[in-house]
């Protein structure tokens, strides 16, 4: 009698499995699905990759106060400060961040750096495509953070050196 109950339970489970096998999938094909460059919609509070801001005069807002680095629980922000001169004015304050790196190998996107910044120099953008084959590509420099554009956009850019992949990307762009 116990065997019949077990067989019935197995048949019920297999019935559910087989019914799910023939339903249409709801998975988007990455990287061809929604993304930053393909019109994805993000909530205002989305915490994506960081962006360093400039003021209305085009100067950097970062004054190298190190509060963002101090607030970071994962210690992924590295800053080196330098003094502004009259001939070389980078920010509106006495100092500026000569080096500003964020290591996305360590970043947990908590937002503490954004909250700690007194000048609103660092904000969260909408970038989320961080996939790469080399961990050193995930250390973003000041120039990459100021532009607001990631150094690489998804996996397609990584394979661009392969001539066949480059031809496929060119054909796709021409459509």
UniProtKB/Swiss-Prot annotation:
Binding-site list for [4Fe-4S] cluster 2: 72, 107, 110, 113
An annotated GO BP: aerobic respiration
Keyword set, alphabetical order: 4Fe-4S, Cell inner membrane, Cell membrane, Iron, Iron-sulfur, Membrane, Metal-binding, NAD, Quinone, Repeat, Translocase, Ubiquinone
EC numbers on record: 7.1.1.-
GO molecular function, one term: 4 iron, 4 sulfur cluster binding
Subunit relationships: NDH-1 is composed of 14 different subunits. Subunits NuoA, H, J, K, L, M, N constitute the membrane sector of the complex.
Cofactor annotation: [4Fe-4S] cluster
Binding residues for [4Fe-4S] cluster 1: 62, 65, 68, 117
Lineage: Bacteria, Pseudomonadati, Acidobacteriota, Terriglobia, Terriglobales
Compartment list: Cell inner membrane
Keyword Metal-binding recorded: yes
Membrane topology: Peripheral membrane protein
Domain 4Fe-4S ferredoxin-type: 50-82, 98-127
Family according to the record: Belongs to the complex I 23 kDa subunit family.
Alphabetized Pfam families for the sequence: Fer4_7 (PF12838)
Job of this protein: NDH-1 shuttles electrons from NADH, via FMN and iron-sulfur (Fe-S) centers, to quinones in the respiratory chain. The immediate electron acceptor for the enzyme in this species is believed to be ubiquinone. Couples the redox reaction to proton translocation (for every two electrons transferred, four hydrogen ions are translocated across the cytoplasmic membrane), and thus conserves the redox energy in a proton gradient.
Catalytic activity: a quinone + NADH + 5 H(+)(in) = a quinol + NAD(+) + 4 H(+)(out)
One term under GO cellular component: plasma membrane
The record's free-text note on cofactor binding: Binds 2 [4Fe-4S] clusters per subunit.
Signal sequence residues: none
Full protein name: NADH-quinone oxidoreductase subunit I 2
């Amino acid at each position: 009698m116990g065997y019949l109950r077990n067989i019935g339970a197995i048949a019920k489970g297999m019935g559910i499995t087989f019914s799910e096998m023939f339903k249409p999938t709801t998975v988007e094909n990455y990287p061809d699905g929604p993304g930053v460059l393909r019109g994805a919609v993000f909530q205002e509070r989305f915490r994506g990759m960081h962006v360093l801001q400039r003021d209305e005069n085009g100067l950097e807002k970062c004054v190298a106060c190190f509060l963002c680095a101090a607030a970071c629980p994962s210690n992924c922000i590295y800053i080196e400060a330098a003094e502004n001169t009259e001939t070389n004015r980078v920010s509106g304050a006495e100092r500026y961040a000569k080096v500003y790196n964020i290591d996305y190998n360590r970043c947990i996107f908590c937002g503490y750096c954004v909250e700690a910044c007194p000048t609103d120099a660092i904000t969260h953008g909408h970038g989320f495509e961080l996939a790469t084959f080399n961990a050193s590509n995930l250390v973003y420099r000041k120039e990459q953070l100021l532009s607001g554009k990631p150094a690489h956009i998804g996996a397609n850019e990584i394979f661009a050196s392969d001539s066949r992949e480059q031809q496929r990307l060119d054909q796709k762009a021409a459509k």
